[in-house]
Each structure stands twice: as C-alpha cells, then as structure tokens.
Amino acid sequence: LVYVGRLSAEKQIERIKPVLNALPDARLALVGDGPHRQQLEKHFEGTATTFVGYLAGEELASAYASGDAFLFPSSTETLGLVLLEAMAAGCPVVGANRGGIPDIISDGTNGCLYEPDGADGGAASLIEATRKLLGNDIERQGLRNAARSEAERWGWAGATEQLRGYYRQVLETNLT
C-alpha cells in the first residue's frame, strides 16, 4: 500500500492504520514529509509502515508503480493531483467519496471509493474498499488499466480546468 503526499493533519493519514490491522500481510509506504511526521511515526509504531521521505522524478514514479493500491484517506480534498499521478503509474486508488475525488474515481471501474463518515471515522468502509481492490488480481489489473486511461483523459489541463471551475463556483456564490 502506498500514500504519497504531505504528512499533515488535514490529510487524515491516521485513517490507514485500521487497514493495516485488518490486513496483517499488508505493508504501507508513506512517501513525503511534513509537520505531522513525528506524530504519524508514533501512531504507526508496531505496524509494517515505512516512512520513505520525499521522492521525485523516477523514484516517485517507481514508488507509485510498486504499489498494489494507493490509499488517499483525506475527505477534504477538492482535487488530489496525486490521484492522477498514481493512476498514470497504474496504481489503483482507494479514496474518500467526498470533494473532487469522485469526479476522478469511478467506484469499481478505475479505483474504489470509501465512505469517510460514521462512528468509526470510515474505518470499516476503508478496510472494505481496500480488501475489494486487493482481493482479485485479475480485477485489480483491470482497475490499473482503467486508471491509466482515466489519467490520460484528464491530464494536467483537465485537472487544472476542474479546479478553476470550483473556484468560479465559489466566487459566483459569494458575489450573489
């Protein structure tokens, strides 16, 4: 399992730990750095988690490509460009069914969505979505291929235009 991004509280990376507890053979690579790293190191202590640090270029592409799944637990993202990076590398995504994420991820087609709400903070849904993605090699390969195709369709121009659209909506709402 792979997470790439800033290690900060708003990314809700702690939500991944129940997945590791439920899937004892799973290993997690946290790629990136940030102000929340020390807290995360304590939180994930005793799990099969590696704090990789910052990567770029071919090393980052290799990290994405080596993952069976990219876990993106944040429920507050307007558009996670790292999702497109993961998908372009053929790493299927498990992401929250919130914000701009469902605009990119079609559940069961090019990745899996989880419901981040609930008394358990979405843990059961995240575990179920991750199990679903990891459970069948043939289906996962189909998700990989569809993820690559979707990333090609979006490209950076499409992602940027979507973000501009969100800003236009906010401005129009606030001006009226």
Where are these regions (language model features)?
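A short, well-ordered alpha-helix in the C-terminal region of glycosyltransferases
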Residues: E139-R153
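Conserved donor-binding/catalytic core segment of Leloir-type glycosyltransferases
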Residues: L1-K11, K17-N21, A29
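Nucleotide-activated donor-binding/catalytic signature segment of Leloir-type glycosyltransferases, i.e.
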Residues: Q38-E58
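Aromatic "clamp/platform" in nucleotide-sugar-dependent glycosyltransferases that forms part
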Residues: S75
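C-terminal alpha-helical cap of glycosyltransferases
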Residues: K132, W156-T176
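Short alpha-helical donor nucleotide-sugar binding micro-motif in glycosyltransferases
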Residues: Y54-L55, S62-G67
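Short hydrophobic beta-strand element within catalytic cores of glycosyltransferases
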Residues: P92-G95, I105
